[in-house]
């Protein structure tokens, strides 16, 4: 496996890869926290640092194109936003009894904010 990440997804993928004895390389920007890098490495991931998140994505896409790696591609995978459309959005709407007026979310892959806003 190979994936570009800025942190949380990479940590989760490193944990799962370790559980299933799958090799994984994670590409991330060089300004990522040392803690995140060490956590991924502790789970057995190979971490490659690039200049930016965009260059991390380019690196992962290029490696996947070689046929030696499979890329989950969190940034373009429609299941990313669909998961939040089907679960997160309806849960927020239900829990606020439809009275929600504002929703604040980080903009990592934008999957959460895109999916939840479609509800």
Predicted regions and their residues:
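A short, small-residue-rich loop immediately preceding and capping a beta-strand
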Residues: 1-29, 99-112
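Conserved PLP phosphate-binding loop immediately N-terminal to the Schiff-base lysine helix
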Residues: 82, 111-114
């Amino acid at each position: 496996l190979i994936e570009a990440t800025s942190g949380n997804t990479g940590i989760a993928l490193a944990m799962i890869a370790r559980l299933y004895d799958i090799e994984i390389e994670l590409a991330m920007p060089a300004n990522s926290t040392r803690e995140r890098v060490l956590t991924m490495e502790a789970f057995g991931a190979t971490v490659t640092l690039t200049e930016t998140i965009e260059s991390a994505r380019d690196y992962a896409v290029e490696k996947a194109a070689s046929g030696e790696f499979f890329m989950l591609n969190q940034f373009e995978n429609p299941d990313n936003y669909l998961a939040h459309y089907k679960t997160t959005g309806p849960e927020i709407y239900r829990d606020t009894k439809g009275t929600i007026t504002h929703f604040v979310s980080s903009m990592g892959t934008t999957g959460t904010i895109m999916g939840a806003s479609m509800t």
